[in-house]
């Protein structure tokens, strides 16, 4: 994986090789960071198939496609605004980060074609893989642990939202649905698809408006972003960016919607691309010893969050 960076040196803090690239088109010479850390992405998922292959025949394929059909029909501007208005109140409960992690033991993500393990397994796999390769970036370890905590929206005490309103790839609403979005064909049944206010390239937005001003399809990403922000986390902006956009594959895989990004977004994208490698490819059947790593992650939650958060 290669990401653009601004600084010019021979190595980054993790020892990754930095290679100079001349664009050859009259633009400034840019530097690329070649991620050369210890974690190696496997070729197949826990089912022995290619990662994020939504067409491969598998026991989960039909269920995943049906999930996206319902998701793409239901995620409208009106729905997103309604959900944000409801959940930004943060009046459901108060609990710690770790208590929230434990709640996720009950759930399996129906939109994920790569894994059928409880969510806390994925959180710890992601965090531990990052920790191994980036030992000095403790904020990134914690981001790995908490990035999916918004999936508590599936829990009865949080409204028990249907999976299509909690998980899956995210995308902007209020502008055209890019064709790179998985199972794009189902957007034709979305009420916003033929709405002239929402179906152009920019829709209700302007060029370079910044992703923070863009309504994203509602789900665990946006909810956890709201929780972290409103509870005054001291995570760097890149951490919040990862939390809100880690499921925005149309952007960080297909480079769609870049016309909405501002300079801060472009800076934070560098870390999102680093994170995505671990989020996607660390999924496996190998268990993490929860009790062994728990004290370390409790120390991080105490560093970057209050002991109890409003949810």
Curated annotation (Swiss-Prot):
Disruption phenotype: Incorporation of the inositol pathway-derived monosaccharides is strongly reduced in knockout AtMIOX1 seedling walls.
Subcellular location: Cytoplasm
Alphabetically ordered keywords of this record: Ascorbate biosynthesis, Cytoplasm, Iron, Metal-binding, Oxidoreductase
Short name of any one Pfam family annotated for the protein: MIOX
Molecular function via GO: inositol oxygenase activity; iron ion binding
Enzyme Commission code(s) on record: 1.13.99.1
GO BP annotations, alphabetical order: inositol catabolic process; L-ascorbic acid biosynthetic process
Catalytic reaction annotation: myo-inositol + O2 = D-glucuronate + H2O + H(+)
Binding site for Fe cation 1: 122, 147-148, 279
Cofactor binding remark: Binds 2 iron ions per subunit.
Positions annotated to bind substrate: 52, 109-111, 151, 168-169, 246-247
Positions that bind Fe cation 2: 148, 220, 246
Family note: Belongs to the myo-inositol oxygenase family.
Function of the molecule: Catalyzes the oxygenative cleavage of myo-inositol to D-glucuronate. Involved in the biosynthesis of UDP-glucuronic acid (UDP-GlcA), providing nucleotide sugars for cell-wall polymers. May be also involved in plant ascorbate biosynthesis.
Protein name, per record: Inositol oxygenase 1
Species per Swiss-Prot/TrEMBL record: Arabidopsis thaliana (Mouse-ear cress)
């Amino acid at each position: 994986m290669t990401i653009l960076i601004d600084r010019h040196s021979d190595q980054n803090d993790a020892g990754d090789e930095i290679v100079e690239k001349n664009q050859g088109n009259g633009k400034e010479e840019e530097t690329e960071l070649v991620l050369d850390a210890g974690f190696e992405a496997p070729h197949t998922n826990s089912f022995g198939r290619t990662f994020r292959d939504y067409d491969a025949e598998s026991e989960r394929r039909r269920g995943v496609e049906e999930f996206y059909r319902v998701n793409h029909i239901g995620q409208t501007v009106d729905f997103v605004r309604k959900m944000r208005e409801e959940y930004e109140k943060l009046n459901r409960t108060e609990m710690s980060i770790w208590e929230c992690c434990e709640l996720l033991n009950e759930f399996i993500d129906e939109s994920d074609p790569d894994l059928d393990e409880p969510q806390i397994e994925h959180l710890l796999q992601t965090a531990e893989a990052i920790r191994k390769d980036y030992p000095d970036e403790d904020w990134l370890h914690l981001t790995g642990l908490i990035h999916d905590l918004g999936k508590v929206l599936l829990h009865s005490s949080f409204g028990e939202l249907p999976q299509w309103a909690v998980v899956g790839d995210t995308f902007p609403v209020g502008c055209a649905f890019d064709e790179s979005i998985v199972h794009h064909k189902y957007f034709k049944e979305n009420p916003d698809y033929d709405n002239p206010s929402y179906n152009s390239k920019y829709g209700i937005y302007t060029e370079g408006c910044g992703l923070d001003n863009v309504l994203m399809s509602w789900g665990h990403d946006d909810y956890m972003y709201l929780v972290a922000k409103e509870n005054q986390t001291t995570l760097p902006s890149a951490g919040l960016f990862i939390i809100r956009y880690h499921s925005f594959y149309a952007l960080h895989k297909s480079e769609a919607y870049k016309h909405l990004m501002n300079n801060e977004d472009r800076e934070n994208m560098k870390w999102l691309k680093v994170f995505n490698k671990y989020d996607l490819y660390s999924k496996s059947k190998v268990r993490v010893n929860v009790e062994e790593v728990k004290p370390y992650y409790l120390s991080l939650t105490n560093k970057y969050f209050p002991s109890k958060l409003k949810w």
